[in-house]
């Protein structure tokens, strides 16, 4: 008996068809029930008990800290919010919340099946691709809001990543223009684009300040590559690690989380080669703040951790090969300019060239910090991380005001 093979694209399409059919039957049945309540009760049926006012969805353990300041704000205001998560050990379960109703809804297709049948006024998520892949708009959700999980450009998502949201919550005013350009050229409706700050940076700022200083500090270099063939670890490997370890300094390598999935063979090879080297630490922890706190300087490429380190630690950064291939990203459709985040790194960072690797100790020693570099870091921070320390409250205020607008409009139409 031959086994049938369904390629991933066809499988995704079939899943979408199945979800669409299920959703249709669900909404038809629900409509019939409400209609019967109306007829038999002589008035409008009671509100659907499964409906939610506010829903927040977290797709992965990496993003739970994006939502913690928002959940804390809902708790402070005594406003109930449904928090759906695809991370079984989400910290929200043990946070002692009274007004945050946390629920694990599974991962992947199981989570999307739940989300696609949702009834809610407002859904907030950091997951892109609404209306593009498995995640479809529910007819019973009034407003979809996307919150950025980086202070970088809003166009640095894969194609159409944020096109079909009703609002995108930004970390800085600078992100608006490119979003508006794509809306106009693609003929899609304008979204609400409130600037709310950066929630996870606010969260980490509090935590990193509480980490005690080392009793005996040794000079430490943090190597933080992005993933993919252009990332510095994949591209240079031993050519960069060998001279770094020859310095005798402590070297922390923090691979991108995706590298463990897409570049596992490379990581295993390098780990085995340098096994037993006491100066080399491989950091796979969820939180990056402990390595950043220890580091005196960071070496990276185009990874978003550059901004975490720059904005939270205010220490010098060296970049190698900071350019990124934009063809798969929304930013590719914005002509005439590179994304702000690419130019910003080159402005406040120090370039490290491949031919400098053999003398990297001297290069780093001579790449001292300066008042000018500190000024440029501060400028980038002010641009990309507005409302520092206020983001959770800002997101709550936006959602509460949007819910009032939706209900006012709905009641006016009845």
Residue ranges with predicted function:
Residues 311-366:
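Nucleotide-sugar donor-binding patch of glycosyltransferase catalytic domains
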Residues 1-9:
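Short, strongly hydrophobic alpha-helical membrane anchors
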Residues 55-205:
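Active-site and donor-binding regions of nucleotide-sugar-utilizing enzymes
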Residues 101-108, 280-284, 347-357:
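Short acidic-hydrophobic, aromatic-tinged amphipathic segments that line or gate anion-handling sites
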Residues 142, 146, 285-332:
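A donor-sugar binding/catalytic signature common to diverse glycosyltransferases
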Residues 267-284:
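Nucleotide-activated donor-binding/catalytic signature segment of Leloir-type glycosyltransferases, i.e.
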């Amino acid at each position: 008996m031959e086994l049938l093979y369904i390629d991933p694209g066809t499988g995704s399409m079939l899943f979408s068809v199945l979800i669409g059919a299920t959703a249709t039957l669900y909404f038809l049945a629900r409509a019939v029930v409400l209609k019967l309540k109306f007829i038999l009760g002589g008035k409008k049926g009671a509100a659907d008990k499964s409906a939610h006012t506010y829903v927040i969805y977290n797709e992965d353990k990496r993003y739970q800290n994006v939502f913690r300041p928002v959940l804390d704000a809902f708790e402070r205001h005594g406003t109930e919010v449904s928090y759906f998560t695809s991370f079984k050990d989400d910290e929200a379960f043990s946070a002692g919340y009274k007004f945050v109703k946390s629920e694990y809804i599974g991962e992947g297709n199981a989570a999307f099946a739940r989300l696609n049948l949702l009834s809610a006024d407002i859904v907030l998520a950091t997951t892109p691709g609404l209306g593009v892949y498995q995640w479809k708009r529910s007819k019973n959700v009034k407003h979809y809001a996307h919150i950025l999980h980086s202070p970088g450009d809003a166009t640095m998502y894969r194609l159409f990543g944020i096109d079909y949201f009703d609002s995108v919550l930004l970390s800085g005013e600078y992100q608006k223009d490119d979003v508006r350009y794509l809306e106009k050229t693609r003929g899609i409706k304008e979204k609400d684009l409130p600037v709310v700050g950066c929630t996870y940076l606010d969260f980490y700022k509090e935590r990193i300040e509480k980490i005690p200083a080392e009793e005996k500090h040794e000079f430490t270099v943090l190597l933080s590559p992005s993933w993919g063939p252009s990332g510095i670890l994949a591209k240079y490997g031993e050519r960069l690690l060998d001279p770094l370890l020859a310095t005798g300094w402590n070297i922390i390598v923090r691979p991108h989380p995706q590298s463990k999935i897409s570049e596992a063979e490379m990581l295993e090879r390098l780990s085995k080669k340098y096994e037993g080297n006491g100066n080399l630490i491989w950091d796979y922890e969820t939180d990056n703040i402990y390595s950043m706190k220890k580091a005196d300087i960071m070496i990276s490429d185009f990874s978003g951790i550059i901004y975490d380190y720059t904005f939270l630690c205010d220490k010098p950064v060296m970049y190698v090969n900071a350019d990124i291939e934009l063809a798969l990203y929304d930013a590719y459709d914005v002509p005439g300019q590179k994304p702000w985040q690419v130019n910003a790194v080159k402005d406040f960072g120090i370039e490290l060239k491949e031919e400098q690797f053999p003398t990297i100790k001297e290069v780093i020693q001579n790449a001292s910090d300066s008042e000018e570099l500190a000024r440029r870091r501060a400028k980038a921070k002010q641009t990309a991380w507005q409302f520092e320390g206020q983001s959770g409250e800002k997101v709550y205020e936006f959602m509460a005001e949007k819910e009032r607008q939706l209900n006012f409009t709905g009641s006016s139409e009845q």
